[in-house]
């Protein structure tokens, strides 16, 4: 089996963190995608306590803080988190932003005896393919449910999985990773850095989060490679 550390998303983002923003900014479509997610989030989240899950370098903090949210910022990559901290310090905002540390940013550490936040959430944002870095969405669903109040809005953008296109382009990589125990996945490469990308279909995402979050809707964001999902926390308690 391939060395899993080699394809670890956290390690990948640590290594590319210094050029992440410039890479993202080089494609003007990314700002349009972020803007659409922003407007959708603001339209649907009425409470004031939110989680920016997998927040990267803090790009979404600008508008979250600007709209008066109390924000828990969760980013497991140290390199990305350090850049986000610099960006937070440069924000001219009175909004309360809680930067979660390395241990708290790992959702696998969350449980009933180790709640990473002080207030239950009204909204959760997971933007720009955060879920595609995570294999076990069922565990993530339970952990997010643990820290969410009833009717918390969970809004997430993930890679839109086009089976035909992916198989025609990445079939050999997909087969190799599947046989190595990664499940349905491909990989991306930036210089010498590689990262696993888990391919979650629309039906799988809806089914996986359905235990604790009711499905509201999903749609493709403009003509991009992203799909937006909207879920609503139900009453089911996490066992």
Per-range role (PLM):
Residues 1-45, 47-56, 59, 63, 155-181:
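Conserved class I S-adenosyl-L-methionine
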Residues 55-109:
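Class I SAM-dependent methyltransferase SAM/SAH-binding core
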Residues 108-124:
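A short acidic, Gly/Pro-enriched loop at the edge of an enzyme's catalytic core
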Residues 122-137:
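A short SAM/SAH-binding and catalytic strip from SAM-dependent methyltransferases
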Residues 138-153:
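A short glycine-rich, Lys/Arg-flanked "PGG" loop and its adjoining helix->strand segment in the class I
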Residues 192-213:
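Short alpha-helix
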